[in-house]
UniProtKB/Swiss-Prot annotation:
Family assignment from sequence similarity: Belongs to the bacterial ribosomal protein bL36 family.
Protein name: Large ribosomal subunit protein bL36c
Any Gene Ontology biological process: translation
Alphabetical UniProt keywords: Chloroplast, Plastid, Ribonucleoprotein, Ribosomal protein
Biological classification of the source: Eukaryota, Viridiplantae, Streptophyta, Embryophyta, Tracheophyta
NCBIfam families: rpmJ_bact
SUPFAM superfamilies with a match to the protein in the record: Ribosomal protein L36
One Pfam family in the UniProt entry: Ribosomal_L36
One CC-aspect GO term: chloroplast
Highest taxon in the source lineage: Eukaryota
Subcellular location: Plastid, Chloroplast
Gene Ontology terms, MF aspect: structural constituent of ribosome
Annotated gene: rpl36
Keyword Ribosomal protein listed: yes
Amino acid sequence: MKIRASVRKICEKCRLIRRRGRIIVICSNPKHKQRQG
């Protein structure tokens, strides 16, 4: 999980989700997991 100021989709399978007021990227590739901090 990377915590970044700006999250973006890295590949086609990345999905942007809003959870508890935070924007999260989930993907089949675990390296692409991101959270906005």
